[in-house]
Amino acid sequence: MATKFPKFSQALAQDPATRRIWYGIATAHDLEAHDGMTEENLYQKIFASHFGHLAIIFLWTSGNLFHVAWQGNFEKWVSNPLKTRPIAHSIWDPHFGESALKAFSKGNTYPVNITFSGLYQWWYTIGFRTNQELYKGSIGLLLLASVLLIAGWLHLQPKFRPSLSWFKNNESRLNHHLSGLLGFSSLAWTGHLVHVAIPASRGVHVGWDNFLTTPPHPAGLTPFFTGNWTVYAENPDSATHVFNTSEGSGTAILTFLGGFHPQTQSLWLSDMAHHHLAIAVVFIVAGHMYRTNFGIGHNMKEILDAHRPPGGRLGAGHVGLFETITNSLHMQLGLALACLGVATSLTAQHMYALTPYAYLSKDFTTEAALYTHHQYIAGFLMVGAFAHGAIFFVRDYDPELNKNNVLARMLEHKEAIISHLSWASLFLGFHTLGLYIHNDTVVAFGQPEKQILFEPLFAEYIQAASGKAVYQFNVLLASSTSPATAAGNQVWLPGWLEAINNPKTDLFLKIGPGDFLVHHAIALGLHVTALILVKGALDARGSKLMPDKKDFGYSFPCDGPGRGGTCDISAWDAFYLAMFWMLNTIGWVTFYWHWKHMTIWGGNPGQFDESSNYIMGWLRDYLWLNSSPLINGYNPFGMNNLSVWSWMFLFGHLIWATGFMFLISWRGYWQELIETLVWAHERTPLANLIRWRDKPVALSIVQARLVGLVHFSVGYILTYAAFVIASTSGKFA
C-alpha cells in the first residue's frame, strides 16, 4: 500500500480526516518537527535547499533575458530609450477579439506586454547593447542554475554532507561570507563596471572577443602599482557627455563627482565603480578579522562575553548570547530577515532618490512599480523577522544559559517596553487622526482657512543641512561659508548641490504640512505594527494570563473551554494581526510616494500640497481620481491597452473580499456547512457513488485565518499593483 501524504509525519499520515492534508501542507516546511529529524540532518537539508533556491532565481532571471531577447525590443529601445516603450514579451493568446489585438499591438507588429521592471535600464547601464548579448547572458545563467542544482543534490549525498561542527564554526563562516560573498562579489562588480559598463557608456564595445586586449584606462596598471591612484580619477566624463557615445567622454574610471549624469539623470558610473571598490576593500579586510586556524584575530565568544558594562546595569551583559545564537536557527533567521528587510526598504528609497540606472527616472511607471515592489517585500521580511524571533523564544530559548543577560533582562521588563510602545502609538494615533478629522470638518463646512497646518521645520532643517537651498535656512551644506561646504567643494559637493536643488530630480523633495501629517500617520502604522510584533515575541513564552504558554507551541487557537480568555494570544496570532497592520502601513507609504510623485510629474505639486491635509482629499484626489483609467479600461464599446490592468484591479478586489469570508465566519459555521453537504452528497443518486478517502472536516481556526490572511494580502497587493501601473502609465505613457 502506498504511503499516504505526509511522509514526514506518521501520526498525520494515519489521520482519517481531511486535516491530514491541511496539517501536512502547514507543517511541510517545519523541518525540525518532522519524524526522525536530527539536528545535523536539519542543517544539511536547509544548506542543500539554498542551492535549489539560487538555481530557481537564476532560472527566473535567465527567462527574463531570454524572453526579452526573443520577443522584446531591446535593440530598438537602446537606439532611443526615451521614446520607446520596453516590451516584456508578446501576448500569445489575444483571444479577446479584434479590439484587443489592436489595443495591445500599439506600434508593434504583434500584441505585447509592456515591462515596468526596470530591466531594460539596468541591462543598458551595465553594458548590454544587443539581443545576442542577452541570449548569451541567458544561457550563462541557465548553465549556472544547472550547476547549482547539481551542487544541491551533491551536498545531500553522504560523502558530501557537511558536519554539524562545520555549520557552527561562526568565525570561518564570517570570514568567508564577509570577504567572499560581500567583498569579492563587490570587487567583481567593480571589475565589470570598469572593464565593460564604463567603456560601453563611452561607445566602446567590450565583449568576450576583446576584453583581454582592451584596457579600461589609457595608463593601464602603472598608476596602481606606483601608488599614483589619482590618475584614475582625472579627466571624468564632461557634463555634455552623450551616453553610449564618445562625445564628451573622458577616461576616468574611479571618481567622486557627486550628483547625476546630466543626460541620463542617473548616478555617474565611475562614482558607482569607486563605491563598489571601497565596499570591496572594507569587506575583504573585515573577512580577515576573525580567529580561525592561525590563532590571531577576534573570537566572537570572547567579544560577547566581554560586553559587560562596568556599572553592572546590564547584569551579565552578552554572556550566553554566543551559544544562544549559534544553536538557534530561528534566531539567526530572524536577524537575517530584519537586516534584509531594512536593506530592501533602503533599496526602495534609493532606487528613485539616487537613481543608479540610465533613464530610469524618466520612466515614471517603472519607478513607481519598483518603489512599491520593494516596500512590500521589506514589510513581509520585517514581519517574518519578528515571527521567527517569537518561534525562537518558544522553541530555542534557554533561561539557564541566558540567566541575567541582556536577553533575559529584556524579557523581565517587557511590560515597560510594551506599555511605552502602546503610549507612543496612542499619542500618534489620536493626534494625527485628530488633525486630519479637524481639517476634514472645516473643509467640509467651506472654511479651509481654519485647517491646522504644521510646517515640518525639523525635517526642512535636515534637508537644508544636506544642501537644499529653497528653505533659506543657511545651515551646513546650504551655507556657502560653512566649513562642511568648504571641505567637499573640490570633490563631490558641486555635483551633489546641483542635484539636490534641481527640480527635475527626486533628491529631497520639497515638503509641507501634508507631508508632516502623512509622515505621522506612517509613524503610527510602524509603531502599532512594532507593538504587536514585539508583544507577540515577548509574551510568546508566557504571560500573567497564561504562564505556561510556551508548552502550547507557537500557534494554538485556545486552551479549550476550560480556560476562558486564552483565545487569540498565541505568538502566531500576533503575527497574524501584525500582517494587517503592516499591509495597512505600507499602503500609506506607497499612497504617499505615488501621489506626491504623480503631482510632481504632472507639473501640479500644488494638488498634493492642498488636498493631502485632509482624508477626503486622499480619497477623492488620489484614489478616486487616479482610478479612472482602471474604470475606463473597457466598456460596451470596446477596450484599450489598460484593460488588462482593469481586470487585474477587479480580480484583486475579488480575492481580497474572499479573504473576509474566512476571517469573519469561524470554524463551527464551516463544520456545519460541510456536514450538511456530506448529508446531501450521500443521498444524491450517482453522486453518492463517489466516496472520499478522508472524512471531510473544516479547517482549524488557525488555518482558516491563514487562508483568509493570504487572500487578503494577495488581493490587496494585486489591486494596488494594477492601480499604480495603470494610473501612472495611463497619464505618462
UniProtKB/Swiss-Prot annotation:
Chlorophyll a B1 binds at residue 653. Its EC number is 1.97.1.12. SUPFAM superfamilies: Photosystem I subunits PsaA/PsaB. It holds the Pfam family PsaA_PsaB. Phylloquinone binds at residue 670. [4Fe-4S] cluster binds at residues 558, 567. Keywords: 4Fe-4S, Chlorophyll, Chloroplast, Chromophore, Electron transport, Iron, Iron-sulfur, Magnesium, Membrane, Metal-binding, Oxidoreductase, Photosynthesis, Photosystem I, Plastid, Thylakoid, Transmembrane, Transmembrane helix, Transport. Chlorophyll a B3 binds at residues 661, 669. One of its GO terms (molecular function) is 4 iron, 4 sulfur cluster binding. It is a multi-pass membrane protein. GO terms for biological process: photosynthesis. It comes from the Eukaryota. InterPro entries: PSI_PsaA/B, PSI_PsaA/B_CS, PSI_PsaA/B_sf, PSI_PsaB. GO terms for cellular component: chloroplast thylakoid membrane; photosystem I. It is found in: Plastid, Chloroplast thylakoid membrane. The keyword DNA-binding does not apply. It is an enzyme of class 1 (oxidoreductase). Its main location: plastid. P700 is a chlorophyll a/chlorophyll a' dimer, A0 is one or more chlorophyll a, A1 is one or both phylloquinones and FX is a shared 4Fe-4S iron-sulfur center. The chain crosses the membrane at residues 46-69, 134-157, 174-198, 272-290, 329-352, 368-394, 416-438, 516-534, 574-595, 642-664, 706-726. It catalyses: reduced [plastocyanin] + hnu + oxidized [2Fe-2S]-[ferredoxin] = oxidized [plastocyanin] + reduced [2Fe-2S]-[ferredoxin]. PsaA and PsaB bind P700, the primary electron donor of photosystem I (PSI), as well as the electron acceptors A0, A1 and FX. PSI is a plastocyanin/cytochrome c6-ferredoxin oxidoreductase, converting photonic excitation into a charge separation, which transfers an electron from the donor P700 chlorophyll pair to the spectroscopically characterized acceptors A0, A1, FX, FA and FB in turn. Oxidized P700 is reduced on the lumenal side of the thylakoid membrane by plastocyanin or cytochrome c6. Belongs to the PsaA/PsaB family. The PsaA/B heterodimer binds the P700 chlorophyll special pair and subsequent electron acceptors. PSI consists of a core antenna complex that captures photons, and an electron transfer chain that converts photonic excitation into a charge separation. The eukaryotic PSI reaction center is composed of at least 11 subunits. This is Photosystem I P700 chlorophyll a apoprotein A2.
